[in-house]
């Protein structure tokens, strides 16, 4: 889970 997608 990337920072821009959570």
Curated annotation (Swiss-Prot):
Its main location: secreted. GO terms for cellular component: extracellular region. One of its GO terms (biological process) is defense response. Keywords: Amidation, Amphibian defense peptide, Hydroxylation, Secreted. The modification 4-hydroxyproline is found at residue 3. The modification Leucine amide is found at residue 6. It is found in: Secreted. Expressed by the skin glands. Belongs to the frog skin active peptide (FSAP) family. Tryptophillin subfamily. This is Tryptophyllin-T2-6.
């Amino acid at each position: 889970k990337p920072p821009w997608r959570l």
